[in-house]
Amino acid sequence: MNMARNVTDLLALSQQEELVDLPENYPLSTSEDEGDSDGEGKRQKLLEAVSSLGRKNKWKLAERSEASRMVSEFNVTSEGSGEKLVLSDLLGSATALSSVAAVKKQLHRVKSKTLTPPLNKEEADRALREAAFSKTSQMLSRWDPVVLKNRQAEQLIFPMEKEPPAVAPIEHVFTDWKVRTPLEQEVFNLLHKNKQPVTDPLLTPVETASIRAMSLEEAKIRRAELQRMRALQSYYEARARREKRIKSKKYHRALKKGKAKKALKEFEELWKDCPNAALQELEKMEKARMTERMSLKHQGSGKWAKSKAIMAKYDPEARKAMQEQLAKNRELTQKLQVVSESEEEDGCTEEGIVSVSHGMDDLQMNADGVNPWMLSSCNSNAKRGEIKTDPEQMPEFVAHVSSESEGDERPVAEELVLKERSFQERVDPNNAKLMDGQETEDSDSQEVLQKLNKESHQSDNQKVSSEENVLHIQREDLASEKLLVLQRLERAHVLEQQGELSKEEHYPKKGLSRPLLKGDWKEMKPLTNPDASGGKKKKEQMIDLRNLLTANSSPVRSLAVPTIQQLEDEVETDHKQLIREAFAGDDVIREFLKEKREAIETNKPKDLDLSLPGWGEWVGMGLKPSAKKRRRFLIKAPESSPRKDKNLPNVIISEKRNIHAAAHQVRALPHPFTHQQQFERTIQNPIGYMWNTQRTFQKLTVPKVGTKLGHIIKPIKAENVGYCSSTRSDLSILQSSQKCLSRKQQKQLKKLSSAD
């Protein structure tokens, strides 16, 4: 600063007028004498300024050295006096002013009161925390309605702010588009060649040019023609919609037949006009049929078929499409059977064989595919159907069916014994006499067996008159039935040997004799000795399988019209018979009992053996710990409580606690519910798509929170809820107490305010 001031003084002095050198004898006047003195003063100042260059001395204030009447308050000194200067002495002359009186009062008030000392660190922190807590609680209390609303909402979808979709006009998209592939190049060439517009106006440039070239009359004719075409198009569309809604099978059959005739007629005309083209068309049709059959695209394993199968429950069009596809699949995969001349002479037409194959397909196909349990029965039925298409053999087939239906109503045990006896009589008549000793004690069952024997003899007489191939097929069927009988009797024998089932009062306590094969009759003769009490032979006891996979006998039918109850009973018996035939080869009951026995053993408490080898005795190869020591360190398990399924032979009740299921158990009433009955009623209602419609199922299983892919979920703002943001006013209490805070706390407050 001193350097700058010196430089300014030098510049000011340089601008003064230069001194003129005069001769030594030149006389000076009084005015000139004064100017000379002024010049010397200026020169003296210049020398002082030059000498002060480079020094760092402060600018010296000018001091008053002479006495004066006017005393200034800006430069008051107390030198020369023994007393100090007091403020009241200076204000003594200003007592009359009103403003000065107010200042005096303030001075007296300040003088009378002492200043409070600053707060220590602990108290300052406590005051800061209290102020921050009160203000923060006041700020957060505004969000209570928003939080409550979000908690009670059924579904929240984020992000909440819906951004308007930015749709760019097609002109901008088209300008930035660049052709990259040869296909795009060809498309663009065609568009520009035909002058197709970029946008989608009502008329193309070609149409506008043609309209402009037309006269008024031509335009009217053209307009009328277009109106007529639109009317015809609407008529055809309405007619097609009406035809599509027709559900008559007869109509669709006639329509399909008409289309087939029309196609055949067109093919004949094409054959007459151009045989080569007709051959090519025929070859194309055959090739298309071959490719469809090889690819098997009409099955239900494709993506389209799976999607249609999902919607078939709700959409009748999808159901119809699935039925058409299955019909097409059956038509393509059907084996074409060539009929020989001998079969044509016997009267076996091609239609009968195709119907049998259709019946086979219907029997073998179910919802998931081929049923392996029905293969044997279907094959036997198919053979019978192919052979018994002769009208002379139809009564025998009807009698066979009626005998089967009546056999379903009889007890199963009588049916088994009858089949075994009839099979023995057919295969070996000499050994049939050995079966006479295995009759039942009940007179009613004996009469039923006699009637059944008569019916079997009558059927045998009819079958003897048939051809040799029919006898061969019947022997195969009887052999399969014999195996079925043996398996069922063996399974009943195993059930009777079980200790758990023998305790039940529903099952007979006497043992069941295993059915004997043809080679076991010789071994049976020395064993069949009379009892000690009497010389009578033991008769075979009838098997009571009512508690197994059997149906109760239905009452005898009357010749009147069957009632609804009888029809329902017939359906039930047929269903149970189908189950028996399906599980004939599997020993389901034995496996079930084995599984139950294993479950009981695993859940039974086990003894704890605490004996350690090598403590108090020798240990090595071939040495076993003593039984006394094992008994000493053996902790026996407490007796378990009796199982709930102890007296239930066909039930397994698992008493093991499932940890995963226990995690989902409710120990307290959930948040939305207020009563226990309300919660239980809600839990009992099914939410699956098997019990509800598709729309209701989607509503019940909608997620609580829904998000969109690729969207950023930002925190909620006060502006979105309807509040005005006042972050600066929120810190007003904190900023008012900055004086009693430390520097570190003040810096933190500044950071908070700058962040807001």
UniProtKB/Swiss-Prot annotation:
What keyword terms does UniProt attach to this protein?
Coiled coil, Developmental protein, Differentiation, Meiosis, Nucleus, Phosphoprotein, Ribosome biogenesis, Spermatogenesis
In this chain, composition skew of type Basic and acidic residues spans 419-428, 452-468
**UniProt-annotated location(s):** Nucleus, Nucleolus
Provide the free-text tissue specificity comment from this protein's UniProt record: Expressed predominantly in germ cells of the testis; weakly expressed in brain.
- Coiled-coil segments on the chain, per record: 215-244, 316-345, 449-476
**GO terms under cellular component:** nucleolus; small-subunit processome
Tell me which Gene Ontology terms the entry assigns under biological process. cell differentiation; meiotic cell cycle; rRNA processing; spermatogenesis
Q: Pfam families from the xrefs?
A: Utp14
Name which cysteines form disulfide bonds: none
Where in the sequence is Phosphoserine found?
S29, S31, S37, S554
Region listing for Disordered, in residue ranges: 21-44, 419-468, 497-539
| Predominant location category | nucleus
Cited function? Essential for spermatogenesis. May be required specifically for ribosome biogenesis and hence protein synthesis during male meiosis.
Misc remark: Apparently encoded by an autosomal retrotransposed copy of the X-linked gene Utp14a. Evolution of autosomal retrogenes from X-linked progenitors compensates for X-chromosome silencing during male meiosis.
The entry assigns this protein to a family as follows:
Belongs to the UTP14 family.
Q: What is this protein called?
A: U3 small nucleolar RNA-associated protein 14 homolog B
Source organism of the structure:
Mus musculus (Mouse)
